[in-house]
Amino acid sequence: ACGIIGLDLGATHITAVLTDLRGRVIASAYSEWPVRSDPDGARARAIELIDSCLARRPSASTRLLGIGVAVPSPVDPRHPERLSTLVLPAWGGRSGFELLRTRFGVPVFIDNDANLGALAEQWWGAGRGVSDFAYIKVATGVGSGHVIEGRVRRGATGVAGEIGHVAIDPRGALCSCGNRGCLVTFVGACALVERARALRPEYPDSSLDPATLTIEAIEAAAIADDPLAVQVVADAAGYLGIAIAGLLNLVNPGAVIIGGGLTRVGDRLLGPLREVVLRRTFVSAVAASEIKHSELGPLGVAVGAATLVLEAALADPALFPTIGAR
């Protein structure tokens, strides 16, 4: 039997999964980590998480086919080892994950996290049977992956899907990319925390403490129907809906799948989001495009990273001359 490792490097966490060849998770491991600012530590921690997953293989004879890595950066398909110095300046423009090939003796494949979220949904989740859809990940950052005519489309240099840097308000807040009013400045985790802190005086009955506000606290409070948290989520849904309406008018996907941590709040996000999209799309067939949650939960992107290896093996078995013994 063979297994595949998938790694999801978020801005503030690392997740590893060991899957079988049907995308089923055999083992998983998770660690909070300052990925953006500590590349050496992130790589070392990733190896520890991989070792943890491999230690829980169902059989010593389960061989490792390859390792897929999802990164929070555009990835040029022609140069997958390169990372954006704008998004991850501390990484110096390179992932450094060649060390995984050396350490584990198997091929390593790297792609953008939203692309791999889309790939996972296409193979195993809410995108099965849908030839054209968009996957949007809402977390610390905001990104999208696009399946068009049955394939993930990355663009000429790998930057397709950077929906987080679509300007919603050109007079808005300054974004880390240097532009103003990018979508991420309205719906990214930091933006939601700041929004909740700013609105707190208007909601004296809210359970949220401005001194200890986190995105996780906002999500939990929204689930509990805290009025401040519900308002923050509704505001985010409004801005996200503006971007999605533009996406629907432009490329007309059959579905939009929302992933990332904010999906934990359920219809408190999707309800107002759908309303905004309906108001802002001018063709009924476009407005009817299904907007739904990811079916794969918090492990979805890591499963997508593993699926990247499986896709490569099916497309070109010659890339896998040997199967690692580990």
Regions found by a protein language model. Name each.
Residues A1-R63, T102-F104, W124, V130, ...:
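ATP-binding/phosphotransfer module of carbohydrate and carboxylate kinases, centering on a glycine-rich
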Residues L7, R57, R63-V193, G304, ...:
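Phosphate-binding/catalytic loop of phosphoryl-transfer enzymes
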